[in-house]
Structures are given as structure tokens and as C-alpha cells.
């Protein structure tokens, strides 16, 4: 599919987006990226995401995804749109509805009259079990839009990201990890580099929705113990009871709807399983060991 195909990558300054830009280029695509701040493209991204080089992109479109009036011509010549746009950490007081839903809706609206052949969207695994969450509602509203759009579409559903595991290593280095709930829920997070490859396979394949996990299935408690093992310190875990965490969520929600929604997602993730097909190859141990050793590209 890559022969003379142009892909637009939206979310290119985020964790997965940076890996996706590099992967699409390596697979022979012409890569256009959408960003509101071109300088950020060439800086290392959040949570060990790599810096993008000028060789990784063919053209940069500077615009504000939340402002369609700045996006004229964005889809010109584009065959495939890849979007990992969404809130990874709460900033600017924006809601999941405003970012995860509305910004992707803006992209979809631009695609329909422009001849874009396919749209690849990164949602989340297990969404059907947590539809009460604002983040899940926003993601699945985008999925519904794509289903009704008339375009070909593909949905990638990761089972969590290695980027979220770095906090375990940080806590282990400090000598104590804090855990919401008993930590016995199972997960199979995936490295961003591996997930980017899954996204390209999905973009080029026939499977409509793809779940993607890493090679390891473990509990949150086991992952925390692994982090302590990697840093060579005794395991010390403090459990925050679920009732206390839920109380904190309600309090935070009274102060800020935006932060309350994010807190509710974090707490809920501490009590449900997130396991899917093992499509990634990088083990969590290898990632944490490389991260601990100071490898800039773990």
C-alpha cells in the first residue's frame, strides 16, 4: 500500500505519534504531519518517545486541530489519515470531549470531501467495559463517526502503553511504590515502537478492529516488583484502598471536571484487566532495564 501513498499523521508530537511518523517513513510512505508547534516535532517526546528528524517527514502542516479554519488544504493529496490525537496528560483545562472527540471529528469532516481513502484511529482496549468514563465515551463517539462516515476505517485498540510504566521505575528508584487497589488486575501493555508497527499493519490490512498488547501478561503488582528488581532495591508497596481513591476522585471532580475525569480513568484502570493479543515483541523487563540504564531510546 505504501507505493506513492501519502499519510497524514495527527498527534505527531505525542508518545505513539512520534513512533508512528518514523514507522510510516520506514515503510515507504510520504509523511505529512499536523502540528501547532513545529519545533516540538524535533524534540524528544513525552515518556521516552524519540525526536523526529527532518528526514522522517516530507512536509509539515502547521495548524490548530481544534480550529478547522486553520486547516485549509490539510488533506490535499492525502490517501491515509492516522490519528492518535487525545489527552495523555491534562493540560489547558480541556476536556476529553473537546480534544479526543471534537478534534478527531474535525479531521473526519475534512476527510470526507477530500478523497481520503482510509482513516486509522487509535482508541482503547476494553472500552465496552468502561463506557461510564468520559475518555471512553469520547473515543467511542469517534469510532461511531467513522462507522457512519462512508470512509474505510481501521481501529487500533492498545492494552496500555509502556510510557505509563515509567512511573513505576521512578517510584522504585525513590524506594516506595504507591498502588491504587490491590494491584492484582492483569495487563499487557505494549511499547510505542511495536504499536506503531501494528498500526501500519492494520492500516494496510483487512481487519477492521485490532487489539494490541505486549508479549507479557502480568499484574500491576508484578510490574511494580519488576521495577524494584531492575533498580536493585527491596520491594516496598503502599496500597491506596479503592474506597479512598474513589473518595479522592469525587473531591477532585468538585474542584475540576477535567482533572476529575482524568482521575476517574486512572483509578478505574487500577481495578480492571487490560489484556489482549500479544502483538508487541519488546518485553517490559527489557524496556525498564534500558530506561534505568539511561538509554535515550529504550
Q: What function would you assign to each model-found segment?
A:
Residues 87-173:
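Glycine-/Pro-rich loop/turn segments that contact NAD(P) or position catalytic residues
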Residues 39-43, 48-106, 110-113, 128:
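NAD(P)H-binding glycine-rich loop region in Rossmannoid oxidoreductase-like domains
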Amino acid at each position: 500500500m505504501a507505493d506513492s501513498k501519502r499519510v497524514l499523521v495527527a498527534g505527531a508530537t505525542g508518545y505513539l505519534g512520534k513512533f508512528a511518523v518514523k514507522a510510516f517513513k520506514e515503510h515507504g510512505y510520504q509523511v505529512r504531519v499536523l502540528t501547532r508547534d513545529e519545533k516540538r516535532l524535533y524534540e524528544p517526546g513525552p515518556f521516552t518517545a524519540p525526536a523526529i528528524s527532518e528526514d522522517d517527514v516530507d512536509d509539515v502542516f502547521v495548524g490548530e486541530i481544534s480550529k478547522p479554519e486553520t486547516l485549509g488544504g490539510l488533506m490535499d493529496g492525502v490517501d491515509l489519515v492516522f490519528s492518535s490525537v487525545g489527552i495523555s496528560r491534562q493540560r489547558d483545562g480541556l476536556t476529553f470531549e473537546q480534544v479526543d472527540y471534537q478534534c478527531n471529528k474535525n479531521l473526519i469532516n475534512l476527510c470526507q470531501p477530500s478523497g481520503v481513502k482510509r482513516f486509522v484511529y487509535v482508541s482503547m482496549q476494553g472500552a465496552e467495559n468502561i463506557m461510564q468514563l468520559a475518555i471512553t465515551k469520547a473515543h467511542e463517539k469517534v469510532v461511531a463517526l467513522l462507522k457512519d462516515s462512508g470512509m474505510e476505517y481501521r481501529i487500533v485498540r492498545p492494552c496500555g502503553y509502556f510510557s505509563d510504566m515509567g512511573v513505576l521505575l521512578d517510584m522504585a528508584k525513590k524506594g516506595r511504590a504507591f498502588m491504587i487497589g490491590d494491584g492484582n488486575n492483569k495487563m499487557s501493555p505494549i511499547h510505542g515502537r511495536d504499536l506503531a508497527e501494528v498500526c501500519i499493519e492494520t492500516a494496510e490490512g483487512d481487519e477492521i478492529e485490532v487489539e494490541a498488547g505486549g508479549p507479557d501478561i502480568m499484574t500491576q503488582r508484578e510490574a511494580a516488583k519488576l521495577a524494584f528488581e531492575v533498580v536493585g532495591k527491596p520491594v516496598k508497596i503502599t496500597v491506596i484502598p479503592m474506597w479512598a481513591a474513589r473518595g479522592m476522585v469525587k473531591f477532585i471532580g468538585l474542584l475540576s471536571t477535567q482533572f476529575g475525569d482524568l482521575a476517574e480513568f486512572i483509578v478505574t484502570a487500577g481495578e480492571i484487566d487490560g489484556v489482549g493479543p500479544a502483538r508487541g515483541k519488546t518485553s517490559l523487563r527489557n524496556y525498564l532495564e534500558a530506561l534505568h540504564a539511561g538509554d535515550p531510546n529504550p
